[in-house]
Swiss-Prot record:
Superkingdom of this protein's organism: Eukaryota
InterPro entries: BMF (IPR028192)
Composition bias, Acidic residues: 8-21
Protein name in the entry: Bcl-2-modifying factor
Organism (species): Rattus norvegicus
Positions of the UniProt region annotated as Interaction with DLC2: 67-75
GO biological process, alphabetically ordered: anoikis; cellular response to starvation; cellular response to UV; negative regulation of apoptotic signaling pathway; negative regulation of autophagic cell death; negative regulation of autophagy; positive regulation of apoptotic process; positive regulation of apoptotic signaling pathway
Residue window of motif BH3: 134-148
Gene: Bmf
Length: 185
């Protein structure tokens, strides 16, 4: 099973330690090849919480493969009967819309008078970039949690409808036994 194209294109400083840091050995769990493994080898995919592509943002996927569950629904969606998690009365506001996470504004610490061609001090740039990548990963985790919660809610609802259907089927097929009180009791 080939890893998805987006895993090969991923440039992620958060999971690529500097030379000499622990975890830079080839067999280490912190090595940069962690997310380039097959889905069976990926330690996070074994938890069934993160697919292999959990580290890929929406901008790295082709539009045909983009995960629609991470997109915000239109404001008219509550009138269309969209399910929300238990106890939630309104749809949560997304931090990023579509590919907007890749077009973040300049950090507040960026000097306003400097030209865009100038680079901020190296430490600030790397810190800001790491924060953005962590925010993307947290957003991805939150989306996955919401998806799993909605899936569980749907399964519970399907189970309840199945029980109602079986009750009505039993009632219709066993009319004589139900009328005469004949049964296993």
């Amino acid at each position: 099973m080939e890893p998805p194209q987006c895993v090969e294109e991923l440039e992620d400083d958060v999971f690529q330690p500097e030379d000499g840091e622990p975890g830079t050995q080839p067999g280490s769990l912190l090595s940069a090849d962690l997310f380039a493994q097959s889905q069976l080898d990926c330690p996070l995919s074994r938890l069934q919480l993160f697919p292999l592509t959990h580290c890929c943002g929406p901008g790295l996927r082709p539009v045909s493969q983009e995960d629609k569950a991470t997109q915000t629904l239109s404001p008219a969606s509550p009138s269309q009967g969209v399910m929300l998690p238990c106890g939630v009365t309104e749809e949560p506001q997304r931090l990023f819309y579509g590919n907007a996470g890749y077009r973040l504004p300049l950090p507040a610490s960026f000097p306003a008078g400097s030209a865009l061609g100038e680079q901020p001090p190296e430490g600030q740039f790397l810190q800001h970039r790491a924060e953005v990548q962590i925010a993307r990963k947290l957003q991805c985790i939150a989306d996955q949690f919401h998806r799993l919660h909605m899936q569980q809610h749907q399964q519970n609802r399907d189970r309840a409808w199945r029980q109602v259907f079986l009750f009505l089927q039993n009632l219709a097929l066993n009319r004589r036994e139900n009328r005469e009180g004949v049964g296993p009791w």
